[in-house]
Amino acid sequence: LKEINNTLEILDSNSLPFLALSPTDVDMPCFRSLAWQIRDALTKGLGFCIVDRLPLNDMSNCQAKTIYWLLAQMVGRPVAQKWSDGRMIYSVTDLGKPSGNGVRPDVTNEEQSFHTDNSYNVSPPDHVGLLCLQPADKGGLSRIVNMVSVMECMNEEYPRLISRLFSPYFFDRQREHSVLDKRTIFTPILSEDADGLRVRVSRNLIYQGY
């Protein structure tokens, strides 16, 4: 916490957009060690990590995003969240919009099915982070499932269906692409590479893809 406070104090006196910051710009060895622990949890552990106890009540939203941005870069390489404008940090806020093609579920108040974020993208990110600045008055609960555990259950109860998950499906791309590109991608839910099992799943986008 001391490193966070010292960094914010220095940055507040040297105005710079947080997106222009790099971990090499700050001296935060303990914070960097935390990032390594997070990365290990994501790649070698359960596949998710919750970081709490950050003094968000003592920070402005901009300061919180600054710390989040630095931590994200220490964990991995950030990528754009929207194709249309290259936005690097994307706000998840209920805008009262109805769900449908071209409308992300995270701007609606509808319950989402289990999915991997950005599954419609040609190259989805390795990890996804969420910074909670203001918990919802009601709802907004997050659910997490470990796909390796799902695979173990399927191997016991539905082993013949597993091979289908390694075959391609059509995914609707949510209009996150050039007008000249195809509106769907054809890719498997499961694949494997040198880093292990890769998962790309969204029931709604698969339905829309067909």
Which residue ranges define each predicted feature?
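A generic structural motif
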Residues: 77-91
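Active-site environment of non-heme Fe oxygenases that use a 2-His-1-carboxylate facial triad
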Residues: 1-31, 36-37, 44, 49, ...
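"Short basic amphipathic alpha-helical interaction patches in structured regions
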Residues: 62-69, 145-146
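A short alpha->loop->secondary-structure connector
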Residues: 68-79
